[in-house]
Amino acid sequence: MEFESTDQGIRYVGLSLFHTRNGAYTGNILATEQAKRERMGRYVSLDLLDTVSQQVAQQLDLGDYRGPFGLDMMVVRGNGSFLLHPCVEINLRRTMGHVALSLSPDDDEILRVMQISYENRYKLSVRRMY
């Protein structure tokens, strides 16, 4: 989840769904908020996601920090169902999730994936998901 901390408080910016390989970031899904929520709803309750974003906005105290931040979460298997680990880490900076949100479509066009690769230098690419 991506947020912004301002003098007026914390504002939810959007959901960021990303891929990892061996624990390292590899890319984000570029889709509307609704499409990402539908995808997450296959695994965890959307009410739970809403509660997490509301609790972060209402109760997280970042002291004097003002700016973008990301809350990394993880969906894990547990006893035949999926569970949400609601706070793996908090990144007090603009994250790749913020970049993905700025590139995400406004309508339900074809899903895309933003990926970072490295072969002598970093390369950002966007491709169709299917």
Which positions does each model-derived feature cover?
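C-terminal structural cap/anchor segments
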Residues: 65-126
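A long amphipathic alpha-helix within ATP-dependent nucleotide-binding catalytic cores
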Residues: 25-82, 121-129
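ATP-dependent carboxylate/phosphate-activation module, predominantly the ATP-grasp catalytic core
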Residues: 1-55, 91-118
